[in-house]
Swiss-Prot record:
SUPFAM superfamilies listed in its UniProt record: Cell division protein ZapA-like (SSF102829)
Protein name (database record): Cell division protein ZapA
Subunit structure: Homodimer. Interacts with FtsZ.
One GO cellular component, as annotated: cell division site
Summary of the function given for this chain in its UniProt record: Activator of cell division through the inhibition of FtsZ GTPase activity, therefore promoting FtsZ assembly into bundles of protofilaments necessary for the formation of the division Z ring. It is recruited early at mid-cell but it is not essential for cell division.
Organism field: Bacillus pumilus (strain SAFR-032)
Gene Ontology biological-process annotations: division septum assembly; FtsZ-dependent cytokinesis; septin ring assembly
Gene designation per UniProt: zapA
């Protein structure tokens, strides 16, 4: 870790190196990068003619969609738990 409790690590996403600085562990940041890389490759398999910018945007849209679906499920579970109390 560097000053201020921040961690710096280099990751590879879709063949490009990125330096990421954050408060999470290197392992966590690498895991996040791996998920992004996997998602980009998954989308590229289905749409091999997309340029890198469109691929990145579609990846972001897909990841946010997945996040929102999980958030909705979490909120429903919270409501169900409160109803049982």
């Amino acid at each position: 870790m560097s000053d201020g409790g921040k961690t710096k690590t280099t990751v590879e996403i879709y063949g490009q190196s990125y330096t990421i600085i954050g408060q999470e562990t290197k392992m966590h940041m690498r895991h996040v990068a791996s998920i992004v890389d996997d998602k980009m490759r998954e989308i590229n398999e289905k749409n091999p003619y997309l340029d890198i910018n469109k691929l990145a945007v579609l990846t972001a849209v897909n990841v946010v969609h997945d996040y929102l679906k999980l958030k909705e499920q979490y909120e429903k579970l919270e409501i169900q738990l409160k109803e049982k109390e």
